[in-house]
């Protein structure tokens, strides 16, 4: 199943942890938006990890939209800006 995940996290350290976690499950398409194509077991695993990181009392918000194949085919992209920077480490040898 295809999932669109967006978040609004005010604490930098926690926001970076969530972004890094989501990078392991999908592709960043906007600064705080990821697309993830996951089987149910992987989705459940991701949800458990996200539940442990999200802090309701600190105003964290995360939304997960499940998109069917038909809906996915109707995604529109407007603009061709550069992809968001990733926090991946780069090693020069």
Swiss-Prot record:
Cofactor(s) needed for function: Mg(2+)
Membrane found in the keyword field: no
EC numbers: 3.1.-.-
Superkingdom assignment: Bacteria
Entries under CDD domains matching the protein: Cas2_I_II_III (cd09725)
GO BP: defense response to virus; maintenance of CRISPR repeat elements
Alphabetized Gene3D superfamilies for the sequence: 3.30.70.240
A Pfam family hit: CRISPR_Cas2
Binding site residues for Mg(2+): 8
Family matches, as InterPro entries: CRISPR_associated_Cas2 (IPR021127), Virulence_VapD/CRISPR_Cas2 (IPR019199)
GO molecular function, one term: RNA endonuclease activity
Enzyme class label: hydrolase
Keywords, in A-Z order: Antiviral defense, Endonuclease, Hydrolase, Magnesium, Metal-binding, Nuclease
Protein family (similarity comment): Belongs to the CRISPR-associated endoribonuclease Cas2 protein family.
Role summary: CRISPR (clustered regularly interspaced short palindromic repeat), is an adaptive immune system that provides protection against mobile genetic elements (viruses, transposable elements and conjugative plasmids). CRISPR clusters contain sequences complementary to antecedent mobile elements and target invading nucleic acids. CRISPR clusters are transcribed and processed into CRISPR RNA (crRNA). Functions as a ssRNA-specific endoribonuclease. Involved in the integration of spacer DNA into the CRISPR cassette.
Assembly information from the UniProt record: Homodimer, forms a heterotetramer with a Cas1 homodimer.
The protein, known as: CRISPR-associated endoribonuclease Cas2 1
Organism of derivation: Chloroflexus aurantiacus (strain ATCC 29366 / DSM 635 / J-10-fl)
